[in-house]
A protein has these predicted regions:
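Beta-propeller blade-edge and WD-like acidic-aromatic loop motif
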Residues: 18-38, 47-48, 54-57, 61-86, ...
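Conserved beta-propeller blade repeats
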Residues: 1-18, 43-63, 88-111, 134, ...
Length: 271
C-alpha cells in the first residue's frame, strides 16, 4: 500500500495499494465496496504513493530498466496520463514520503549513488521543479513527513548508530527534538497534529505533541504490539483508526487490518 505510509488514505473510504509480482502497479482500494481499481499501467516497480491534498492526483516513484528512477504523478479520475515530476536516474532509489499541506513541497527519500544511505530532498511542485537536499550528511536521513500545520518535520536518522525519530522546524530547519528512545522508524502525524506515531520492532508507539507556536513532545507510549509483514501504515481522518497491512501467508493475498479503539489509558494521557 502507499502513502506517507503505504496505506495512504485521502478520506476514510479509498486507499492506495501497491500490488503485483514482477512489475508492480498502484491500485485504488475502496474500503466501502471492497473493490480494486488499477491506476498505473506503465512498466516498472512503483513505490511511495501519496495523495495530493486536493485528492485529485497520486504522486509516486517508478523504477524502470530503460529510464531509471522517476518521481511521477497521475490523475485518479482517469482523465490524463502520468507526468514525470523529477527524473533522478543517477539515484538507485527515490521514494516520495510527504507533501506539505498546501501541496507546494514534496519530500523524497533519495538513496545516494553509492547506495550507502538516504538523504531527504525537497521538490517544489510548481515552476521549474528543481529538487534540492534538505537533510544531507554522512548519516542516513529518511521517512520525512510534514506536520498537518506545515510547521514541523518528523524524520529518521541513524547518526547515533541506531535509527531514531526526530522533529525539526520546517521548512527552515532548527530546534531539533529527539522523539524515540529505543529506536524508531516510519513516523506519522495524526490528522489533528496532536499525536506523532512511529514504529519500533513490532510495536506502534504514540507520543502526545504540541505543534503550534513551539514544539513539545510527551513520553512515548506503546499503543499496541503485533507482527505485520509490511511496515507501512496510515492514520484515518477521524484519528481513531490505524490502517495496517498484514500478509496471511506466502501464497495468499495481503489483507488490510483496521485497528480500532485506542487503549483507555492513552485517551486519558492525551493533552
Amino acid at each position: 500500500m502507499g502513502g506517507g505510509s503505504d496505506g495512504d488514505c485521502i478520506d476514510n473510504h479509498v486507499v492506495t495499494v501497491i500490488a503485483g509480482s514482477g512489475d508492480s502497479d498502484i491500485w485504488l482500494y475502496s474500503l466501502q465496496r471492497n473493490t480494486l481499481t488499477r491506476l498505473t499501467t506503465e512498466q516498472g516497480n512503483k513505490m511511495g504513493p501519496l495523495w495530493t491534498p486536493d485528492g485529485k492526483r497520486v504522486v509516486y516513484s517508478a523504477a524502470t530498466r530503460s529510464h531509471g528512477m522517476n518521481v511521477m504523478w497521475i490523475p485518479v479520475d482517469g482523465g490524463g496520463a502520468q507526468q514525470v515530476l523529477w527524473s533522478g536516474s543517477e539515484s538507485p532509489m527515490l521514494i516520495p514520503t510527504s507533501l506539505s499541506p498546501d501541496g507546494k513541497l514534496l519530500l523524497i527519500d533519495r538513496l545516494d549513488a553509492g547506495g550507502r544511505g538516504f538523504d531527504e530532498w525537497v521538490l517544489p511542485m510548481a515552476g521549474e521543479r528543481q529538487a534540492h537536499p534538505l537533510l544531507q550528511s554522512e548519516f542516513s536521513e529518511q521517512w520525512g513527513v510534514v506536520s498537518p500545520n506545515g510547521f514541523w518535520l518528523a524524520y529518521v536518522s541513524d547518526e547515533t548508530g541506531s535509527s531514531e525519530v526526530y522533529v525539526q522546524s520546517f521548512p527552515e530547519l532548527g530546534n531539533r527534538v529527539q522523539i524515540s528512545e529505543l529506536g524508531g522508524f516510519e513516523p506519522a502525524w495524526s490528522r489533528s497534529g496532536h499525536e506523532l506515531f512511529y514504529r519500533t520492532g513490532d510495536k506502534v508507539m504514540v507520543v502526545p505533541v504540541e505543534t503550534e507556536k513551539h514544539f513539545r513532545a510527551g513520553t512515548p507510549q506503546a499503543l499496541f504490539e503485533d507482527h505485520y509483514d509490511y511496515s507501512d501504515y496510515d492514520i484515518a481522518l477521524d484519528g481513531a483508526h490505524l490502517l495496517m497491512i498484514k500478509g496471511q501467508n506466502e501464497s495468499s493475498p495481503t489483507h488490510l487490518n483496521v485497528v480500532l479503539n485506542w487503549p483507555e489509558e492513552w485517551k486519558r494521557a492525551r493533552p
